[in-house]
């Protein structure tokens, strides 16, 4: 509420009923999804596991009015596109619609997915995870990419499922620049993206990554091990960046 948010995209796993209850009370629009991420396991049992998790996600949370979108995967081609992926995604999309005819389906693409791709035509709406101005490229690439995609696919509902930059509260600079991990660059980044988003009302939704810093064992960035510092607040929820 304090940041003016009206929607939440949940991370790629099952969440506590407490959080869904809180979103119901707050009137937030929720995107809930299964942990089908990064790369597809081609084993038949793996897809059955995905189907099982989709069924459980919907059955357990069907009655939460805050949930408006079921997500079928996140950055599933970051490890390469495997044979059978499109069929698996289509099957998960059909399963979600079979179990719940009232809600839309969505997908979060990794930035490298081409603008012309069959995955764009599976779910009801689609979004991209873009980090231009952080992991690569320039800040201005955000609006350039969005406008080009919209020109190519004016009838496809496009959103941003992730965007962000890391800021460590003890790092500061009078001349902030990309990858310096300062609060100042994080502010420059988000001020730019806020303007980009505001000027494009055709974006169906935008979701910042992330509301809070969070633990991640594999990470070692900015001199801080085991933590992703993209949060708008610190890990302990005490400091607003």
Regions found by a protein language model. Give the residues of each.
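Extended substrate-binding grooves/exosites of carbohydrate-active enzymes
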Residues: 1-241
């Amino acid at each position: 509420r304090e940041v003016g948010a009206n929607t939440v995209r949940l991370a790629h796993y099952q969440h506590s009923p407490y959080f869904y209850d809180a979103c119901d009370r707050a009137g937030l629009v929720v995107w809930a999804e299964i942990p089908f991420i990064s790369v597809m396991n081609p084993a038949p049992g793996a897809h059955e596991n995905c189907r099982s998790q989709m069924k459980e996600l919907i059955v357990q949370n069907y009655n939460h009015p805050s949930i408006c979108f079921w997500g079928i995967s996140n950055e599933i081609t970051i490890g390469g596109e495997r044979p059978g992926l499109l069929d698996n995604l289509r099957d998960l999309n059909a399963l979600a619609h079979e179990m719940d005819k009232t809600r839309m389906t969505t997908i979060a693409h990794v930035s490298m997915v081409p603008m012309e791709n069959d995955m764009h035509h599976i779910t009801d709406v689609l979004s991209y995870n873009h980090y231009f101005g952080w992991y690569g490229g320039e800040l201005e690439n955000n609006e350039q990419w969005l406008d080009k995609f919209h020109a190519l696919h004016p009838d496809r509902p496009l959103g941003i499922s992730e965007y962000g930059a890391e800021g460590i509260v003890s790092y500061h600079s009078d001349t902030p620049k990309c990858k310096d991990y300062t609060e100042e660059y994080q502010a420059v980044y988000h001020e730019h993206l806020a303007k980009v988003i505001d000027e494009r009302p055709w974006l169906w939704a935008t979701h910042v990554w992330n509301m809070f810093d969070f633990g991640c064992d594999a990470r070692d960035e900015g001199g801080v091990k085991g933590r992703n510092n993209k949060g708008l607040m610190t890990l302990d929820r005490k400091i607003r960046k």
